[in-house]
């Protein structure tokens, strides 16, 4: 989706990658093809969601085509009741990350098995 942020277009893509490592690699390859085809070069992009990646393979792939994660302490989001790992991420291109927040509390872990991530950027 394209979002108008103070007169500037930001492309936002939400993902939920598969559980099988090979499947995730193929999905990220398709994501790259989609971005190259649909998003103008140099335009700001946000890719966020459940990457289901317990390692760093997907992060390396995304950085290979210019998407970078917040350089901040890990934001544990899974499982929601007692978050121990970070499977949910926000990757960006062309935006300055300002903050990343994980809301806590019963209302949040009742909605999903993952806690949400709230990200703030500077254009």
What is each of the regions a protein language model found here?
Residues 1-123:
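Active-site regions of metal-assisted phosphoester/phosphodiester hydrolases
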């Amino acid at each position: 989706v394209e979002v108008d942020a103070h007169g500037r277009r930001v492309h936002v893509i939400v993902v939920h990658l598969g559980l099988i490592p090979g499947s995730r690699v193929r999905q990220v390859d398709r994501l790259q093809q989609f971005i190259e085809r649909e998003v103008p070069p140099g335009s700001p992009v946000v890719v966020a969601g459940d990457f289901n990646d317990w390692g760093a393979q997907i992060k390396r792939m995304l950085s290979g085509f210019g998407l970078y994660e917040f350089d901040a302490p890990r934001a544990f989001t899974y499982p929601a009741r007692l978050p121990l790992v970070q499977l949910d991420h926000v990757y960006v291109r062309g935006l300055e990350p300002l903050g990343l927040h994980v809301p806590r509390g019963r209302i949040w872990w009742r909605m999903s098995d993952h806690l949400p991530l709230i990200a703030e950027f500077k254009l």
